[in-house]
Amino acid sequence: MARNRLTESEMNEALRALDGWQKVDGREAITRSFKFKDFSTAFGFMAQAALYAEKLDHHPEWFNAYNRVDVTLATHSENGVTELDIKMARKMNAIAG
């Protein structure tokens, strides 16, 4: 999977197809807040996403409070968003349903 930083237009195009994701202000990253019915469901989402992140060797920044999971994705080695981040975002959306 390519780790080349996406151009602004590539990132904008990818975000149009990613429900709920947006650019982070003041940083080259994307973010989304997921809300679930309860803590167990939120934690289950994180467990599934973590297993996928390990396969991809690309790990999210995230924060969990009860039924909410806030996620930020960026490829630190490229100082920006790459196809790996887009792939991870797609998978997280699929897991969340």
Curated annotation (Swiss-Prot):
Its EC number is 4.2.1.96. One of its GO terms (biological process) is tetrahydrobiopterin biosynthetic process. InterPro entries: PCD_sf (IPR036428), Pterin_deHydtase (IPR001533). GO terms for molecular function: 4-alpha-hydroxytetrahydrobiopterin dehydratase activity. It is an enzyme of class 4 (lyase). Pfam families: Pterin_4a (PF01329). It catalyses: (4aS,6R)-4a-hydroxy-L-erythro-5,6,7,8-tetrahydrobiopterin = (6R)-L-erythro-6,7-dihydrobiopterin + H2O. Keywords: Lyase. HAMAP family: Pterin_4_alpha (MF_00434). NCBIfam families: PRK00823.1-2, PRK00823.1-3. Belongs to the pterin-4-alpha-carbinolamine dehydratase family. This is Putative pterin-4-alpha-carbinolamine dehydratase. It comes from Brucella melitensis biotype 1 (strain ATCC 23456 / CCUG 17765 / NCTC 10094 / 16M).
